[in-house]
Regions:
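A generic structural signal for beta-strand entry/edge sites
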Residues: 327, 353-357, 397
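Extended Gly/Ser/Thr-rich low-complexity repeat segments
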Residues: 366-382
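C-terminal accessory/binding modules appended to enzymatic or scaffolding proteins
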Residues: 322-344, 348-349
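Conserved small/polar residues in nucleotide/adenosyl-binding loops
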Residues: 389-396
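Extended, charge-rich low-complexity regions and/or helical-solenoid scaffolds
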Residues: 356-364, 369-370
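Charged, amphipathic alpha-helical stretches
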Residues: 2-46
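Long, hydrophobic alpha/beta structural blocks
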Residues: 29-324
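Short, ordered beta-strand-loop transition motifs
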Residues: 113-115, 322, 349-357
Length: 400
């Protein structure tokens, strides 16, 4: 699925567009015990409650593709004959009326997902009469292309509110509000089957994870019977480790600045192009980039090999998972420097009197703990000048 296809399905989760007639739910306590189950017809809910329910479900299709939303492919063997795929198909084809399939699914989730508190499992089914889309991108609502029948699973933490004072308008008094339980934003979930090329793709599901650092291996193994993908935060850390280890003494500030700048540039260009397909790079792409930065060929090849070992041969990585476009940091055990990436090239490293320094150009507006300071040349008192702030790794911490 690409971003346009995800957005198209997200728009379904509104009261005036959805064909969701009911939502199945299972409330689980901190002991992994089922407290209650329900089958809630949306038509019987007040409009505001119906919209809130759809809003919770819709958030399972939010976030960044490749970071929070990840394709989960099924093998041909799984589609032909496997318990996990058969169960998902039973949920979809029965429109959540197969009681045995719903029970088995709830039990599978409970056995594989063990958060600290209580949580809610929601299942919804929708049938989407996909409108025809012309080559110029215009959608013809009265011309159906196919029927997309799918299920959406959402797992939400349920948190207890704290006792607070509330104002009673009719009585014009303040009272303690009772402790209540509130459904939080989805923690994980999935869409099955995927909406690929604007039609059902039973060879794939779209998995959602709110946290870029969590993987929920047991849940993924139980529901999809496959190895969990490396979380986005772990990808970033692994990428940095590979870069430093493979390049070794060739991993200079200039090289890292250039890699960061080029990856950010690729992200910006992709965003400007409005290409719905996700932006990806491979270890081979990075090898070419490193060579262009002046990295010796053998070290660039070592990097490519390490990428294949850690991420998989010819793995397609999202640049958004490898760099932070709005932050550039330099750290030592005692120093942390944060710079707007637009000005990262202002920073340089240099040896002065045999000691390594990090140099930052310091013009007007320099502050220390909120106090504006003057930087003067040693031989010129009170002279206004543009100088350099020298940071020895064990002496100073500066933020830009």
């Amino acid at each position: 699925m690409n971003e346009k296809e995800i957005s198209e399905i997200r728009r379904r989760f509104r009261a005036d567009k959805s064909n969701i007639t009911h939502v199945r739910g299972c409330y689980v306590n901190e002991k992994q015990e089922i407290v209650s189950q329900f089958d809630q017809p949306l038509s019987l809910l007040p409009q505001e409650e119906c919209e809130n329910m759809l809003s919770v479900l819709r958030r399972t299709l939010s976030g960044t593709l490749g970071k929070n939303l990840i394709e989960m492919p099924f093998t041909t063997a799984q589609v032909v004959d496997s318990d996990e795929h058969r169960l998902l198909m039973a949920l979809r084809d029965s429109k959540l009326t197969d009681e045995e399939a719903v029970r088995m699914f709830f039990e599978k989730v409970i056995a594989s997902y063990r958060p600290e508190g209580t949580y809610l499992i929601l299942l919804a089914n929708d049938t989407y009469d996909v409108p025809y889309r012309a080559k110029d991108g215009e959608t013809l609502e009265d011309a159906s292309e196919n029927i997309y029948n799918y299920v959406l699973c959402t797992v939400c933490p349920v948190k207890q509110t704290k006792p607070v004072l509330g104002y009673d308008v009719p009585e014009n008094t303040f009272h303690n509000r009772d402790i209540d339980w509130l459904v939080s934003a989805p923690q994980l979930g999935f869409l099955f089957p995927s909406f690929t090329d604007r039609s059902a793709d039973i060879y794939s599901a779209m998995y959602y994870c709110r946290s870029a650092s969590e993987s929920y291996d047991e849940f993924i193994d139980a529901v999809f019977n496959r190895e969990a993908p490396m979380p986005a935060e772990e990808q970033k850390t692994t990428f940095g480790t590979i870069l430093g280890d493979a390049l070794n003494d060739a991993c200079s500030l200039d090289v890292v600045q250039t890699v960061h700048s080029r990856l950010c540039g690729m992200i910006e260009e992709h965003k400007a192009s409005k290409d719905p397909e996700p932006l990806t790079i491979t270890g081979r792409t990075m090898k070419t980039m490193l060579t262009a930065c002046g990295v010796p060929g053998e070290k660039a090849e070592k990097f490519e090999k390490a990428c294949a070992e850690q991420f998989g041969a010819d793995a397609a990585l999202s640049p958004r998972n490898l760099v932070e476009t709005k932050k550039f940091e330099i750290e030592t055990p005692e120093v942390q420097i944060r710079v707007d990436p637009e000005y990262s090239e202002w920073i340089e490293t240099r040896y002065i009197d045999g000691a390594p320094y990090i140099l930052i150009p310091a013009g007007a507006g320099v502050q220390v703990n909120g106090v504006p300071i003057a930087i003067t040349r040693p031989d010129v008192e009170y002279e206004e000048t543009v100088s350099y702030t020298h940071l020895r790794a064990h002496e100073t911490c500066a933020d830009l």
